[in-house]
Regions:
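Acidic, glycine-rich catalytic/binding loops that coordinate metals and/or anionic ligands
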Residues: 151-168, 173
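Short glycine/serine-rich loop segments
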Residues: 116-158
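Short, low-complexity, charge-dense intrinsically disordered segments
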Residues: 172-181
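Basic nucleic-acid-binding alpha-helical/helix-turn surface characteristic of O6-alkylguanine DNA
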Residues: 1-116, 162-169, 182
């Protein structure tokens, strides 16, 4: 069984779905994702295992913190069990891309052990079921362009700007920002 949560953020309406194994789906804000949010709404509030509800709440909290610039990495467990091996390998390699940094599709392919599979990596990123938790927005085209993004290019640009901005703030200022009440 799956637990789902739909929630408002300053960036727009988002949703998550989790199983007892971990986070299985993140739905980003945007027109393209209206159907996915509608599907999540059909399961939100249903009985689900406690572990699934815990993972969904944890994912929501971490997404909110991330979008406020107060989280750099996601610790929520992922449920990628239904995905093919190559896709899992690429997603786990992408999860290790540091906050505020970018890599090219080719570099990510090499990190996943398939240096000649840049296009296949691009397809995996396009189908990433858990964006933000697996930061596919940090993967860019070799020529310096943004590359594709399932959550729309403007959102990718905004996510990268958030990270680059927060990376340029001094550690003291960052501590002060974290200490402020919401």
């Amino acid at each position: 069984m799956t637990a789902a949560r739909i929630f408002e953020t300053p960036w727009g309406r988002m949703g998550v779905a989790a199983t007892a194994r971990g986070l299985a789906r993140v739905v980003l804000p945007g027109k393209r994702n209206a159907r996915a949010l509608a599907r999540l709404a059909t399961i939100e509030g249903r009985q689900a295992p406690r572990a699934a509800r815990v993972h969904a709440r944890q994912a929501e909290r971490q997404i909110r913190e991330f979008l406020r610039g107060r989280r750099r990495a996601f610790s929520v467990r992922l449920d990628l069990a239904a995905l093919p091996r190559f896709q899992k390998k690429v997603l786990l390699a992408a999860r290790r891309i540091l906050y505020g940094r970018t890599v090219t599709y080719g570099q990510l392919a090499a990190r996943a052990g398939k240096p000649r599979a840049a296009r296949a990596v691009g397809q995996v990123m396009a189908r990433n079921p858990v964006p933000l938790a697996v930061p596919c927005h940090r993967v860019v085209a070799a020529g310096g362009g943004l590359g594709g993004f399932g959550g729309e290019a403007a959102l990718k640009r905004r996510l990268l700007a958030l990270e680059f901005h927060n990376n340029t703030i001094s550690p003291q200022r960052r501590r002060e920002r974290r200490g402020k009440s919401e």
